[in-house]
């Protein structure tokens, strides 16, 4: 009996003695337990820790030089001082658009939404003061002729300028029900989307789902394609990830970034790659292929940003300099 007791005690002490292998086993078991407890949803506490770790890694790495293939035309304070408060009359935006096209960019992206008509258009301006002009002869004929004159319709001027080059117009999605959704109102990207799984449908995708879009007015919606520019900051206001696609009525719509990248590459299709693990009624993404380029995403189709650096890391041009032709090149 003493021998058995001694062996049992020795075995217990041996099992309790810490070793790197045992520590690894404990960590793996703890991680599995946490994953089983929380599933795909990461608690806010752990998400906050992840975000801070990522921030620290970018600060330690420092600024990375850009390729100068992306140039940002900024409607900055100097532009507002010179051309007036925003929003500008759209004949000025049309002139800015044309001057950017003249510089020869591969694609022009607008992270601006033109959801209402330009109230400064002369044709609309005179129409609002119809009562003042009521004493004039043939006022209705005059106003109709003014409305058809493209030089007096700023929205048509901007639409024609946008259509003269390769561009992507931005729009936004709303996610809360506001009872303003209209049937038949949807964006019109020129992208073809396919799935790499034959047994899946768009309705199966695990993505953000929008309630309705806020799109550009028809006179201006003349771009080569359209893409949303919604962003979703974390609790500290930092944007760590961006969605490449958002679902609307069980159809995935691409972001402004995806469409600009695709048009630069000259591709017509994006292929969504689905995970073979998990519930087939809620398929997670693993990435997106555009041409020969594979872009890895999280399960919701979000891309983790690789920050190049702080503000002004990419080349910025003042819109005022572009409009004035002050020796700037794009």
Label the model's feature ranges.
Residues 1-6:
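Short, Lys/Arg-enriched N-terminal segments with co-localized hydrophobic residues
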Residues 8-298:
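Non-transmembrane functional regions of envelope-associated proteins
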Residues 237, 250-256, 266, 298-300, ...:
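Extracytoplasmic
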């Amino acid at each position: 009996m003493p021998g058995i007791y001694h062996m049992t005690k020795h075995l217990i002490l041996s099992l309790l003695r810490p070793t790197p292998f045992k520590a690894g086993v404990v960590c793996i078991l703890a991680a599995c337990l946490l994953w089983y407890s929380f599933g795909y949803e990461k608690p806010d506490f752990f998400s906050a820790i992840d975000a801070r770790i990522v921030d620290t890694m970018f600060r330690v790495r420092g600024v990375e030089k850009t390729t100068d293939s992306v140039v940002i035309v900024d409607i900055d304070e100097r532009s507002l001082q010179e051309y007036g408060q925003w929003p500008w009359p759209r004949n000025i935006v049309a002139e800015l658009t044309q001057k950017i096209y003249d510089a020869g960019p591969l694609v022009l992206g607008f992270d601006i939404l033109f959801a209402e008509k330009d109230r400064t258009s002369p044709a609309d301006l005179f129409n609002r003061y119809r009562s003042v002009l009521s004493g004039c002869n043939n006022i209705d004929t005059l106003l109709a002729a003014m409305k058809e004159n493209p030089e007096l319709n700023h929205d048509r001027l901007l639409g024609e300028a946008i259509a003269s080059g390769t561009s992507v117009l931005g729009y936004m999605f709303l996610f809360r029900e506001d009872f303003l959704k209209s049937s038949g109102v949807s964006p019109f990207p020129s992208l073809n989307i396919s799935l790499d799984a034959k047994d899946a449908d768009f309705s199966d995708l695990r993505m953000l789902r929008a309630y309705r879009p806020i799109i550009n007015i028809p006179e201006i919606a003349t771009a080569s394609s359209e893409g949303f520019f919604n962003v979703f900051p974390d609790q500290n206001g930092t944007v760590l990830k961006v969605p490449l696609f958002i679902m609307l009525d069980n159809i995935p719509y691409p972001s402004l970034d995806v469409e600009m990248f695709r048009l630069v590459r000259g591709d017509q299709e994006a292929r969504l790659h689905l995970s073979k693990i998990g519930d087939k009624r809620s398929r997670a993404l693993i990435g997106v292929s555009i041409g020969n380029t594979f872009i890895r995403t999280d399960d919701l189709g979000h891309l983790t940003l690789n920050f190049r650096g702080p503000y002004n890391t990419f080349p910025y041009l003042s819109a005022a300099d572009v409009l004035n032709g002050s020796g700037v090149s794009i």
